[in-house]
Design a protein with these regions (language model features):
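Cytosolic, long alpha-helical scaffolding segments
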Residues: 1-206
Length: 206
């Protein structure tokens, strides 16, 4: 007997997820530029904040659309989980930018720039995977790449934390940079959480 599917007419969900993903790509590059040129490019903090607000707005639109759509293209709970995971990526990037100003940072260690580079790569892979959501194309290879980048991020943050304590920095400096390093790593972790949701969606609907 043929399998019956109720296919919704709207493609809005995919459009909104693409918007969220592209917003992350831009935000990640801005964060890398900020860290590479801090404090000269403090102006980028405000620009990152604008993109964080855009991320919140898209998340709100997705949640509203779930609530008013009778038949969603994929499970409504999965849509919500993916939207919030993507929003978390943006929130952590924004938090890092805020902390640079809040903590009065004068100089950025190379490990933080390395971490931001990992964020850029992870977000780019995530955007590729989001682009495959419509049609449920296999993204297993891309998701493996994101996991590999998360491992790389873990390695960098462990090395950065060890150096902070080893080099005898002022305790306040250690606390400041430990927070920033951890939030950069959380941004990558949120990419991996998003990837896990995407994997679940693919397995449920293929």
């Amino acid at each position: 007997m043929a399998k019956i599917r109720l296919i919704p007419q709207t493609r809005e969900f995919y459009t909104l997820f693409d918007r969220a993903a592209q917003n992350l790509v831009v935000t990640a590059q801005l964060l890398l530029d900020l860290l590479e040129h801090y404090p000269d490019r403090r102006d980028l903090v405000d620009e990152i904040k604008e993109h964080e607000h855009e991320g919140d707005a898209v998340t709100h639109e997705i949640v509203q659309l779930v609530n008013k759509t009778f038949v969603t293209p994929i499970d409504g709970e999965d849509i919500y989980d993916l939207a919030t995971a993507l929003d978390d990526v943006c929130d952590f990037m924004d938090q890092v930018a805020d902390e640079l100003n809040l903590y009065g940072v004068d100089e950025v260690p190379p490990e933080a720039i390395e971490q931001a580079g990992v964020v850029v790569k992870a977000v780019s892979k995530l955007a590729d995977a989001i682009g495959c959501l419509d049609g449920l194309k296999d993204v297993s290879g891309t998701l493996v790449d994101i996991h590999t980048l998360e491992d790389e991020g873990d390695r960098i943050v462990r090395g950065a934390t060890a150096r902070l304590f080893r080099d005898g920095h002022d305790p306040l400096v250690v606390i400041k940079w430990k927070d920033i390093h951890e939030d950069l790593e959380q941004a990558v972790d949120s990419c991996e959480r998003s990837a896990h949701v995407l994997e679940s969606i693919y397995l449920k609907n293929r």
